[in-house]
Amino acid sequence: MVGRSGRTAVFEKLPGLISDLKLDFVVVNGENAAGGFGVTEEIFHDTIRAGADVMTTGNHVWDQREALDFSKREDRFLRPYNFPKGTAGKGSGLYMAKNGARVLVANIMGRVFMHPDLDDPFIAGEEILEACPLGEQADAVIFDFHAEATSEKICFGHFVDGRASLVVGTHTHVPTADCQILTNGTAYMSDAGMCGDYDSSLGMDKEEPLNRFLSKVPKGRFEAARGPATISGIAVEISDRTGLAEKAAPLRIGPRLEETIPAFWS
């Protein structure tokens, strides 16, 4: 979610999507929800009330300082797992879906072109799966891999293929065209895209980014774009027997991009 525009779209549309598509579990990445920079506790609670089961984040998680406080007490708020040991909050959790399934959600951040000093995301993923394996403690496993490099995201997907239900990338704000089920049954998409105004620069008002490209001199702050938002994401049908993906498709609803709703749920 990016800014007020993205929040409004999610809060208005998500309850209907849950009802119409019979969604058992919903994950929303909210790291840009507060004006494009971080998330407040109020926004977190509003997102949960709208129907999200878990909120994931990324490199902007601490942009709103209050997140350092409420992350300690909100079980359904995740920051990247591979932050240094002792960091406030947590990076993974086991949750109950509406159908009774036990869903492990983990938030991991990439290092390529981002934060090379973070703990290794592949070692982190292995640690998470060893502690809560698919088919044993968890009926489904979802990774939000928050990263810049598509190569790092897809390699992580291959690394956990057959051991996770879904690996979905976040961070670039642009939905990719590679939604697929990998060889051993893990659904994958390099980036889910954003819930925000696509008449923008990644959800931010386009004038200041454009000015900086042209003049190299900042004139003001980046501010979230305020036009009508498009909801972007991925929908996955997971086997009750194996915990692996049976179907996966992109989800886009809104005025700017071509709309698509998974045919297997329409």
Provide a role label for each language-model segment.
Residues M1-S266:
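Acidic, metal/ion-coordinating pockets
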